[in-house]
């Protein structure tokens, strides 16, 4: 199978190349075009618009996008230019392609909801907050509008069970909404958390009892390979590990991996919220947005994608995957 991966040089893209290149021919589409092991050739976005510049492609995995900026320094229009605009461009190319039959778009759980009081399901009415989630949901809507013209209803796409509508043109589309992605080599909020705990600094947010879903990059690779190789119905699919963990449990996983004792302080929530507010003013690592990410409840159901793939569990459980991620941090 000839597979085109946009954003091929990113964290998820690099992992997908390793996972898929053994049995497929991988092409890249990115803003930079250095050579990469496992990738036959990487094209520029300008080449996408040139006649006969691209090879015959069987499947597209669209990862290219602007990630969530927890420091809030990015202009809103940049999110829409990248997350919405590039999605429209590559999706239009997919729909016009004579050979491509599978399209996987990596959206985000934040496109569905900023906060989740109970469990996030695919049929939720999207209520994103901020340009990151809003730009992703606008990209989703562009895709859904096009699919309706091919006989695939929004209801079928967002059903909590795999849908039954088949596109008239035979082109399947999968919209993945992953929660926080982790894996060896990834940087982000987990790396920040690791930096605090590994230095023996007590964790001051123990008073926040929460549960959240994480997403192992290995499980993402497994799911992508599944929809590419199996007869999986088009649809919106939440992506996450099987188990939800609290931040306190995550601290314990980090300490266990490092052979350290966990020091969790249960400082009153009101005081810590005030500290985060000051951190936002002074542009410190702990600001209100990062505080929310570390303490919020955000549990996402992965029942639909597992049913579509015909599995009961993903290959990597949350604790196992997080330990692998933390062990990688420790080697750096």
Please state what every model-predicted region is.
Residues 3-23:
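N-terminal Rossmann NAD(P)H-binding glycine-rich loop of SDR-like oxidoreductase domains
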Residues 217, 252, 275-312:
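Conserved C-terminal active-site "lid" loop/helix of NAD(P)H-dependent oxidoreductases
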Residues 186-192, 206-228, 234-235:
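Substrate-positioning beta->alpha
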Residues 304, 312-332:
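Amphipathic terminal alpha-helices
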């Amino acid at each position: 199978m000839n597979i085109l991966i946009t954003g091929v040089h990113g964290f998820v893209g690099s992992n997908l190349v390793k996972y898929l290149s053994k049995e497929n021919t991988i092409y890249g589409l990115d803003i930079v075009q250095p050579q990469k092991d496992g990738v036959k050739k990487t094209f520029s976005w300008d080449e996408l618009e040139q006649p006969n510049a691209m090879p015959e492609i069987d499947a597209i995995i669209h990862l290219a996008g602007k990630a969530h900026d927890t420091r809030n320094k990015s202009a809103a229009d940049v999110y829409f230019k990248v997350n919405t605009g590039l999605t429209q461009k590559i999706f239009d190319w997919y729909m016009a392609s004579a050979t491509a039959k599978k399209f996987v778009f990596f959206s985000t759980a934040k496109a569905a909801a900023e906060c989740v009081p109970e469990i996030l399901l695919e049929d939720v009415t999207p209520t994103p907050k901020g340009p990151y989630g809003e730009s992703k949901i606008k990209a989703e809507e562009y895709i859904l509008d096009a699919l309706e013209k091919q006989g695939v209803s929004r209801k079928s796409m967002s059903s909590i069970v795999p849908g039954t509508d088949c596109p008239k043109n035979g082109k399947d589309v999968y919209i993945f909404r992953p929660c926080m992605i982790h894996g060896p080599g990834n940087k982000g909020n987990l790396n920040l958390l690791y930096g605090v705990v590994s230095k023996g600094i007590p964790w001051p947010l123990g008073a926040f009892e929460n549960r959240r879903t994480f997403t192992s990059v290995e499980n993402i690779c497994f799911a992508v390979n599944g929809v590419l190789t199996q007869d999986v119905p088009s649809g919106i699919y939440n992506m996450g590990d099987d188990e939800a963990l609290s931040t306190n449990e995550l601290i314990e996983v980090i300490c266990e991996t490092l052979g350290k004792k966990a020091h969790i302080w249960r400082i009153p929530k009101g005081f810590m919220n005030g500290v985060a507010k000051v951190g936002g003013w002074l542009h410190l690592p702990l600001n209100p947005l990062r505080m929310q990410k570390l303490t919020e409840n955000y549990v996402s159901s992965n029942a639909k994608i597992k049913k579509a793939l015909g599995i009961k569990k993903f290959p990597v459980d949350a604790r196992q995957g997080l330990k692998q991620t933390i062990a990688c941090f420790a080697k750096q």
